[in-house]
Amino acid sequence: MAQFYYKRNVNAPYRDRIPLRIVRAESELSPSEKAYLNAVEKGDYASVKKSLEEAEIYFKININCIDPLGRTALLIAIENENLELIELLLSFNVYVGDALLHAIRKEVVGAVELLLNHKKPSGEKQVPPILLDKQFSEFTPDITPIILAAHTNNYEIIKLLVQKGVSVPRPHEVRCNCVECVSSSDVDSLRHSRSRLNIYKALASPSLIALSSEDPFLTAFQLSWELQELSKVENEFKSEYEELSRQCKQFAKDLLDQTRSSRELEIILNYRDDNSLIEEQSGNDLARLKLAIKYRQKEFVAQPNCQQLLASRWYDEFPGWRRRHWAVKMVTCFIIGLLFPVFSVCYLIAPKSPLGLFIRKPFIKFICHTASYLTFLFLLLLASQHIDRSDLNRQGPPPTIVEWMILPWVLGFIWGEIKQMWDGGLQDYIHDWWNLMDFVMNSLYLATISLKIVAFVKYSALNPRESWDMWHPTLVAEALFAIANIFSSLRLISLFTANSHLGPLQISLGRMLLDILKFLFIYCLVLLAFANGLNQLYFYYEETKGLSCKGIRCEKQNNAFSTLFETLQSLFWSIFGLINLYVTNVKAQHEFTEFVGATMFGTYNVISLVVLLNMLIAMMNNSYQLIADHADIEWKFARTKLWMSYFEEGGTLPTPFNVIPSPKSLWYLVKWIWTHLCKKKMRRKPESFGTIGRRAADNLRRHHQYQEVMRNLVKRYVAAMIREAKTEEGLTEENVKELKQDISSFRFEVLGLLRGSKLSTIQSANAASSADSDEKSQSEGNGKDKRKNLSLFDLTTLIHPRSAAIASERHNLSNGSALVVQEPPREKQRKVNFVADIKNFGLFHRRSKQNAAEQNANQIFSVSEEITRQQAAGALERNIELESKGLASRGDRSIPGLNEQCVLVDHRERNTDTLGLQVGKRVCSTFKSEKVVVEDTVPIIPKEKHAHEEDSSIDYDLSPTDTAAHEDYVTTRL
């Protein structure tokens, strides 16, 4: 295949080697640019600064050059998290480009802050974003800094950007037909979809919601619901949208985890944001929890804090209920269940009485309703047993006593469903599958009652049941009543939700029903296909003569595939093995037809039994396992829905007492009629300003309390998120890389400090020497006419016999050499021990007038290793000659070998009282061999000898050194 990718030379042999070359070659970097980028990579601050300064002067380096990986110097510094280099590069106005996005992706908060505060030069050309070439950029055009920061979920970076006033585009709906959406989708549908996904991914960031949303709970609820709906529409990005939806749900749950008291929890769960300040609202109706159930926020609802509050309200009348023995619980529930008629009558007569208030408790209400439904099932059982039998041959039998007792329950169920639909709305009503089951059950009972009435009115004769018509109203009513009994018994499963053991099982059963419906759709298609084929094959062989029973339900099955309906029944019952194989035979000797029919029948059984049935088992197993993995959350969510239905104010009385008008219901009815029918005659009394003001104040107080609690929750959540991130971070390869980078940067910083200290010390020495020269020239007047300029450094060697001995002992030197460092003014009291402080520097030798000629050769010491022995010997001989004359001449001398050495600069100040010595700082730098101009020689005289000594400064023009001897001290200046 190589010939498809590489050009082959015609004259080359067949087994020639494939030449390789770089097809997409890029421009090479110059050595200076490579060194510049390498210095940035290693964190060499001094080299980078030097390169940037040279680039401004000589223009030899492109400071915006790119390495083979496509990184500029700024991006390399951001990747290495070197804030000093980033600040340096920005000060030289390097090209920023996507540096802010790279810093956000790298989560370098300091770099992001520097880039946000960096102001571009006014002369820089501003290119519109639409004209920028984004082909080689790592980020798509729709990625803005705030969107990328939200993707990384870095709270600090998001806060910095939000403080700058950034904004996020509002995503349009999937079915939006505006001009912008239509044009964007037509131009590039993929970019349009990815852009919407990136925006939603940013909006779903927990840090962004916590920082910018006034009501984070409501934002998380609505966004998770919207993302869940988007996952159903955009199947291409279904997994991404579902993951974002789960992220929003988890954020709401984690935020609720931060509540620390029941007061905070009640403020959160009772907050209502859909009312204005002047509208009256209840402060204890769990409005936020109802909203969470509506948006199916299972993690939020099943959160332990929320469940604890619900449980405390559920068992309000029975504190410590869960700690009681199960036998005590059962006996208590049984007694309350038996007394539910008494409680109901008391509530009808006196709703505000103790018993009337007792039945309004959620737990008591649940027990009473359950006892009422169990009584209804008991009546159904009695009706099915026909205890009070009537004449079975009567075509229109009258209702029995049990049926008369069942009728109030049926009417009570119907009235309860009507009230529920009226209060919650049709949409909320049909979303609950149990309501649909109740609707079917009540419809069957209504149809049964109607048919019973028709049969009782129309048919009164006695006829044997065998002679009745197939569609006789009594027969149809009995069939519908039997089906309704099944639904009524199965409806009891909904009460299993209250139990922790049966609740998860009931939820798994409901999920399996969905799998069964999916399976039935495919199975019906297969069933209809084979039924059509078999009926087409056996239609011509229908048997009608000599048969007392026709069909597959006969003792001897026949005509199994004669009609389409009969074929469907035969194929269905064949799954359970109830159809014999001989039904594929025909009376005629048509073996081919029998073979084809048997083959079709066998193929159907293989597909339905082996494939489809096992697929159904696998689907049901998967659904059960899914529920089992989240059994606690699913069960608590279902139980909360059951509890919330009993927390409502209405529906206190159980069936059948709910059909009896209570005094409260009659009062509400009269009030409604009076308001709607007589509203023209009477005007509504306006509320006073005081009432409106108090209501507004209460609502405003609730709002402020909610915002205060929300502020505390957000702070706790952010702190917990940061702690968790630090805990889970651990040691990674990236950390090791950062550590190496820090070590490298520290190394170059130390080297830079050493080089910088050399230059700074030289400059300070020059300044100090210049000042000293000026002072001397002013004090001496015009006695010395011409003096040469101060040299680059001023080296002073102080010689004292005792000090030299001490220095020799401490430094293991034969001549006690050391350097003198200048003391700051605040440390003048330590001048006595200055030799110990400067023992590692310069030239220090001991001189004495008595034995100068003997010790001179052994007391000269050189710090620089580059000074040759010959130069040292020559300097020694010259010094001996000068000392033999009693003075040292002054002049210009070339000092070789001081290429890289440390010297100490001595600065002396003259006062009227004393001659003080200030020891200069160490100078470490690189010097070339140069002429050193020595201006004068100043003796250093102790205080006690100051009165006996005179200024012996003597000028010499061409002497290599200038030395003045004063008793025990000799001053030598180069």
UniProtKB/Swiss-Prot annotation:
Assigned keywords, A-Z: ANK repeat, Calcium, Calcium channel, Calcium transport, Cell membrane, Coiled coil, Disulfide bond, Ion channel, Ion transport, Membrane, Metal-binding, Phosphoprotein, Repeat, Transmembrane, Transmembrane helix, Transport, Zinc
Coiled coil: 223-260
Regions crossing the membrane: 363-383, 404-418, 433-453, 476-498, 512-534, 600-620
Region (Disordered): 765-787
Gene3D superfamilies, per the entry: Ankyrin repeat-containing domain
Ranges facing Extracellular side: 384-403, 454-475, 535-599
Cellular localisation: Cell membrane
Molecular-function GO terms, alphabetical: beta-catenin binding; cadherin binding; inositol 1,4,5 trisphosphate binding; store-operated calcium channel activity
GO biological process: calcium ion import; gamma-aminobutyric acid secretion; oligodendrocyte differentiation
Basic and acidic residues composition-biased segments: 773-784
Subcellular location, principal: membrane
A Pfam family matched in the record: Ion_trans
Described function: Forms a receptor-activated non-selective calcium permeant cation channel. Acts as a cell-cell contact-dependent endothelial calcium entry channel. Forms a homomeric ion channel or a heteromeric ion channel with TRPC1; the heteromeric ion channel has reduced calcium permeability compared to the homomeric channel. Also permeable to monovalent ions including sodium, lithium and cesium ions.
Cross-referenced NCBIfam families: trp (TIGR00870)
Name of this chain's protein: Short transient receptor potential channel 4
Gene: Trpc4
